[in-house]
Amino acid sequence: MGADGTMSPVLTKRRPDQEINKLDIKPNHEVDIARRAPHSKPPFTLSDLRSAIPPHCFHRSLLMSSSYLIRDFALAFLFYHSAVTYIPLLPKPLACMAWPVYWFLQGSNMLGIWVIAHECGHQAFSNYGWVNDAVGFFLHTSLLVPYFPFKYSHRRHHSNTNSVEHDEVFVPRHKDGVQWYYRFFNNTPGRVLTLTLTLLVGWPSYLAFNASGRPYDGFASHYNPNAQIFNLRERFWVHVSNIGILAIYYILYRLATTKGLPWLLSIYGVPVLILNAFVVLITFLQHSHPALPHYNSDEWDWLRGALATVDRDYGFLNEVFHDITDTHVIHHLFPTMPHYNAKEATVSIRPILKDYYKFDRTPIWRALWREAKECLYVEADGTGSKGVLWFKSKF
């Protein structure tokens, strides 16, 4: 039996990477972004979808997963070595142009490492739980992410996706829950300011203060072992994660005292800022779309909630980000599936999903602006069930 509770099938042969990379998971027709996704109970089950996927797609290979991690580490070292060796040799005007290139490349590569750590939390890295947690703890901690607390809250996000009462993050407000001052930011300058702050500090604010998260009584923080986010069994591991984060901060402090704060910010700080911005950008756009429903407890069920996500195209960054961007729907349906099989699985189930599958081709920055403008709160539209809620923007 597999870790996700399914019987381990006889494995079929995995396609070569060259074939997988050529798979086109985009629908072969333009999707009307204004056309709402179906919200009725789908005519298929999770078992139907699983049966349509080649069995090898569920196989988690420690060797294969490690090869992607080694690739990311090699790129991280290459970018670091190039930055510290060659950028100081450049004339100042060229150096000023080279540093942003390094920051973008290293920050993007860090997001790939972040995704592998996220897979460890889903037990998708290998068949060995202790390996998954050891690797995930090391990777996420090095990126200033408390591995175990995020693993626990993220698991509950997957268990309650698009439930307005029980989802964990990017929980939309009802119209009467929108703070009065939001109306003053519902314009171009306000959105620019809001988006900038959200991208820069949104991820650490969520971890530290549960910003945009599910409301809890008391101080809800991923660093607080007594927060209602966690049960008694999980609190010990919150302490372990906190110790790991403190150790990283101490290492950073020592680097700042020996190499200097400007060096540390240039080599590590700004790339982490880029990483954090990508985390917010990607997760926001995966779960915010004018055509996607949310549900209250009268209508919500797990399958419909998991289907109400959207895949998007980030161009060459899809591969850098291990396809968490363009295969997010399949990830919510089968979170223990490793990323390198997600494209093939998506292609396999798309004929069954039909209109339940959403792929938005809109360029990312245009989509970010549209969603920030149109996805301000949710409410029933009066034409169907009061338990099905849609994004609105008019006050």
Swiss-Prot record:
UniProt function note: Converts a single cis double bond at position 12 of linoleate incorporated into phosphatidylcholine into conjugated 11-trans and 13-cis double bonds. Produces punicic acid (18:3(9Z,11E,13Z)) from linoleic acid and conjugated octadecatetraenoic fatty acid from gamma-linolenic acid. No activity with cis- and trans-vaccenic acid, alpha-linolenic acid or homo-gamma-linolenic acid. 16:2(9Z,12Z), 18:3(9Z,12Z,15Z) and 18:2(9Z,12Z) are substrates for the conjugase to form trans-Delta(11) and cis-Delta(13) double bonds. No activity on the cis-Delta(9) double bonds of oleic and palmitoleic acids.
Family to which the UniProt record says this protein belongs: Belongs to the fatty acid desaturase type 1 family.
UniProt-listed InterPro entries: FA_desaturase_dom, FAS_N, Fatty_acid_desaturase
Membrane topology qualifier: Multi-pass membrane protein
Pathway the protein takes part in: Lipid metabolism; polyunsaturated fatty acid biosynthesis
Oxidoreductase recorded as keyword: yes
CDD domains attached to this UniProt entry: Delta12-FADS-like
Protein location: Membrane
Main location: membrane
UniProt motif (Histidine box-2) ranges: 154-158
Transmembrane segments: 73-93, 97-117, 130-150, 192-212, 236-256, 264-284
MF-aspect GO terms: oxidoreductase activity, acting on paired donors, with oxidation of a pair of donors resulting in the reduction of molecular oxygen to two molecules of water
Listed EC numbers: 1.14.19.-, 1.14.19.16
Span of the annotated motif Histidine box-3: 328-332
Note on domains (UniProt): The histidine box domains may contain the active site and/or be involved in metal ion binding.
UniProt keyword annotations, A-Z: Fatty acid biosynthesis, Fatty acid metabolism, Lipid biosynthesis, Lipid metabolism, Membrane, Oxidoreductase, Transmembrane, Transmembrane helix
GO CC, any one term: membrane
Keyword Lipid biosynthesis applies: yes
Catalytically driven reaction(s): a (9Z,12Z)-octadecadienoyl-containing glycerolipid + 2 Fe(II)-[cytochrome b5] + O2 + 2 H(+) = a (9Z,11E,13Z)-octadeca-9,11,13-trienoyl-containing glycerolipid + 2 Fe(III)-[cytochrome b5] + 2 H2O
Top-level lineage group: Eukaryota
Name the UniProt record assigns to this protein: Bifunctional fatty acid conjugase/Delta(12)-oleate desaturase
Species whose genome carries this gene: Punica granatum (Pomegranate)
